[in-house]
Structure formats: C-alpha cells, structure tokens
C-alpha cells in the first residue's frame, strides 16, 4: 500500500469548505485524476458510484461515506485501485486544515506499479487541494 498525505490551510469556515468538498459530483473539476463520476445509489450519507480515472480510462467502483463538516471517506470497492481516500476538515483557529490521506495500491498484477503511480497521485492531490483552496478563498 502507498500512503500519501497532503494538507493545506484554507482561510475560511468549516461550512464553506464543506459546501465545496462535499459536492462530490464536482470532483473532476478539482481532481484531474478523476475524469467522470456516475452516482449509482444513495442511502443517507452513503453513496455508491462509478468513477473513470485518468489512468488508462479505467472504471472503478467507490463507496463514499459523508460525515458532514468532518470527513469524506471514499473506499475503492472494485477496479484497478484498492484502498481509501479520506478528506478531513480540521478546524484551526479561524481557518480549516483540509487534509487528504490516500492508503492505496493498484490491484492484481498491476500492484507492482503502485510505487510508480504514488508520485503521480501525490502531485494530483497537491493540485486538487490548491484548486479547492483557491475556489473557496476567491
């Protein structure tokens, strides 16, 4: 498994940050590694969806758990990616620390390439966090 942690401090309220990051249908706007999202079902705070990732246009299934104003936990349930991506909102003084933690690997025979894609995922996450921060602070 590759663990990747990226965080940024956003000059805003938890409510405003949550408003932007919890709109998970908007994910491709900020996360360039996600090309397309399709919600399959929604029950309370649990969303099941199919995403198309930029890596070879692969489709993956995810189960998303929303904990309002706290975190978004995406668990990859089927496809080339195996593991989780967790986005946390951590109040800090009058700001919010937005922290993304990946615990992920490529599944099956592709597992040997996990180390290679780790830097790509980290770079994409840094760009996404920067874009989210800019959107919120504008």
List each language-model region with its residue ranges.
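Hydrophobic ligand-binding cavity/cleft-lining segments
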Residues: 1-44
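Amphipathic alpha-helical segments that line or abut small-molecule/effector binding pockets
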Residues: 15-18, 126, 130
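Glycine-rich portal/gate segments that line the openings of hydrophobic small-molecule binding cavities
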Residues: 38-81, 97, 127-138
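Beta-strand/loop substructures that line and gate deep hydrophobic ligand-binding cavities in soluble
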Residues: 77-123, 127, 134
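Hydrophobic/aromatic beta-strand elements that line small-molecule binding cavities or substrate pockets
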Residues: 6-8, 51, 60-65, 84-91, ...
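Short acidic, gly/pro-rich beta-turn/loop elements at beta-sheet edges
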Residues: 16-18, 29, 59-61, 74, ...
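Beta-strand elements of well-folded, non-transmembrane domains
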Residues: 10-14, 53-57, 66-68, 104-108
């Amino acid at each position: 498994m590759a663990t990747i942690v990226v965080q940024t401090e956003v000059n805003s309220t938890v409510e405003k940050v949550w408003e932007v990051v919890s709109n998970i249908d908007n994910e491709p706007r900020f996360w360039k590694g996600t090309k397309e999202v399709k919600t399959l079902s929604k029950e309370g705070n649990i969303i099941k969806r199919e995403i198309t990732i930029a890596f070879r246009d692969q489709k993956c299934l995810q189960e998303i758990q929303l904990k309002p104003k706290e975190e978004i936990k995406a668990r990859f349930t089927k496809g080339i990616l195996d593991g989780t991506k967790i986005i946390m909102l951590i109040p800090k003084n009058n700001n919010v620390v937005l922290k993304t933690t990946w615990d992920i690997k490529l599944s099956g025979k592709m597992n040997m390439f996990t180390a290679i894609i780790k830097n790509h995922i980290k770079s994409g996450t840094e760009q996404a966090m920067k874009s989210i921060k800019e959107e919120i602070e504008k």
